[in-house]
Amino acid sequence: QPLGQPAQYEPPGREAVFHTENGILNFGESPASGAEDWDLINAGKKAVTLKPGASFFHHADSFAMVRGGHLDVAILGAYEVAQNGDLANWSTGPKGVPAVGGAMDLVHGAKRVAVITGHVTRDGRPKLLERCTLPLTGVGCVTRIYTSLAVIDVADGRFVLREKLPALSIDALQAVTGARLLIPGPV
């Protein structure tokens, strides 16, 4: 679940201002267990903390920020990502319960779209594919993917491997990826 994860891993000495579509700007990491204030939650109903200068605003203002192109990066989860950058993250098909949320606005309003996801499904099927099989959230919108196994860019209709787990061979990674990985040099 990507909601809240980026705020957990902000590098020391660097500052990012995080936005949640339910109306908080500049939230921080998750509070310690037992210290949650359930009036301070993100769009995924996870408790958050506030950083200095945080602000609250109406949901309509939040989506004006999103739709107005004021977000540098949207970080979303995914059921599937295609090598051309297509994203499927709101429906698992006829048997699932669809949940669009604000993802369609985010993929069109943010300057860049990054995905955080497991590399494979619970039953071991690749989530990174030549083409998505599920209903799309956005067409050609994803530029970077952070999976449980690798960091992959989407460029010129290809998956470009940037980083991988050190103990994982490229062949093993390719075997669980549903499209060819381009390896531009040492990884």
What are these regions (language model features)?
Residues Q1-N26:
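N-terminal low-complexity or amphipathic/hydrophobic leaders
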